[in-house]
């Protein structure tokens, strides 16, 4: 398990939260070497989204 701690301005945190909300699987797949890696990327971004939501950045 890897734990990441980052410091972001509110502007950056909000922009990142918007990105992880909007990015679709097709973009993930087009940047992955195969489907398996695309699913790993999706799962990792979901954890980032949860972390941002826990910090108060959860766009609708």
Residue spans of the language-model regions?
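Positively charged, low-complexity terminal tracts
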Residues: 1-7, 11-60
């Amino acid at each position: 398990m890897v734990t990441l701690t980052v410091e972001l301005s509110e502007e950056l945190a909000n922009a990142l939260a918007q990105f992880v909300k909007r990015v679709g699987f097709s973009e993930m797949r087009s940047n992955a070497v195969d489907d398996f890696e695309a699913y790993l990327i999706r799962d990792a971004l979901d954890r980032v989204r949860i972390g941002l939501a826990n910090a108060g950045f959860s766009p609708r």
